């Protein structure tokens, strides 16, 4: 399993695929599958049966996962996509933006 540089809560932009250019917050990262769920991106229709929680049932829009390689982190300082580096500060590893050299 490789070390992923994108975490839940990061703001990312889709750089490839049908939703290219869309931005959103990472809701969940699946490390074993190299996929992530991004808020408002890659919406799919799920058909749900009536239940106690949803007595009506019907069709519900829900986010599906997207490949990690198709998203890039947005630098909070420059608001552009950036690559992520890891360096040691003191005795902790921290992520930093390669464009602005700012700790994320």
UniProtKB/Swiss-Prot annotation:
UniProt xrefs under SUPFAM superfamilies: Translation proteins SH3-like domain (SSF50104)
Record keywords: Ribonucleoprotein, Ribosomal protein, RNA-binding, rRNA-binding
GO CC aspect terms: ribonucleoprotein complex; ribosome
Keyword check for Ribosomal protein: yes
Listed GO biological process terms: translation
Protein name in UniProt: Large ribosomal subunit protein uL24
InterPro entries: KOW, Rib_uL2_dom2, Ribosomal_uL24, Ribosomal_uL24_CS, Ribosomal_uL24_KOW, Translation_prot_SH3-like_sf
Record note on quaternary structure: Part of the 50S ribosomal subunit.
GO molecular function, a single term: structural constituent of ribosome
Keyword Amino-acid biosynthesis annotated: no
Annotated family: Belongs to the universal ribosomal protein uL24 family.
Top-level taxon in the UniProt lineage: Bacteria
Task performed by this protein: One of two assembly initiator proteins, it binds directly to the 5'-end of the 23S rRNA, where it nucleates assembly of the 50S subunit.
């Amino acid at each position: 399993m490789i070390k992923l540089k994108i975490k839940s809560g990061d703001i990312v932009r889709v750089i490839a695929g049908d939703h290219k250019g869309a931005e959103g917050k990472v809701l969940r990262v699946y490390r074993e599958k190299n996929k992530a769920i991004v808020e408002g991106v890659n919406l799919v229709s799920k058909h749900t049966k009536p239940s106690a929680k949803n007595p009506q049932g019907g069709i519900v829009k829900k986010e599906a996962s997207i490949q990690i390689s198709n998203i890039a982190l947005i630098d909070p300082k420059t608001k552009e996509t950036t690559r992520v580096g890891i360096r040691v500060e003191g005795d902790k590893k921290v992520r930093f933006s390669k464009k602005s050299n700012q700790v994320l």
